[in-house]
């Protein structure tokens, strides 16, 4: 059975690492043929570019950023499944401004699923950018960081 490579960029370790590690550990429980590559975005991306023979890939992006459009195209062209779990977002009304809707729908076409923090964000997307649902799937999942707080 061919290995699936699961890429997990993590640049702000103090904020993101524990939550990303929980994601990795929960995946390991259910999938046996997966190899994880976790590190800074630069390190992870360099590994992908260097290893052109990898066929099955999953990339857990930290959010959708138009600066990385060419990178998303590169990953999609290689057959990589791209998922997003933003590390910034609002779960409270006062944080609503943290959610950016300045997203290129061409990028959304390349992203398999977007995991979002709250119903508040989901409802904002429905209200302001309903057309996003024509390009990608959005699921309210919360963030593993909150799971760490509850245990």
Regions found by a protein language model. Name each.
Residues 4-151:
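Active-site and donor-binding regions of nucleotide-sugar-utilizing enzymes
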């Amino acid at each position: 059975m061919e290995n699936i490579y699961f890429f997990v960029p993590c640049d702000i370790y103090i904020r993101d690492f524990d939550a990303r590690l929980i994601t990795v550990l929960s995946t390991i429980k259910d999938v046996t043929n997966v190899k994880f590559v976790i590190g800074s975005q630069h390190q992870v991306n360099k590994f992908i570019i260097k290893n052109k023979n990898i066929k099955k890939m999953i990339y857990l992006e930290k959010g959708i950023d138009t600066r990385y459009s060419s990178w998303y195209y590169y990953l999609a062209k290689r057959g990589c499944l791209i998922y997003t779990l933003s590390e910034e977002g609002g779960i409270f009304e006062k944080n609503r401004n943290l959610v950016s809707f300045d997203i290129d729908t061409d990028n959304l076409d390349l992203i398999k699923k977007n995991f979002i923090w709250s119903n508040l964000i989901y409802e904002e997307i429905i209200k302001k950018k309903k057309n996003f649902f024509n390009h990608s799937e959005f699921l309210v999942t919360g963030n593993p960081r909150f799971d760490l707080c509850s245990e």
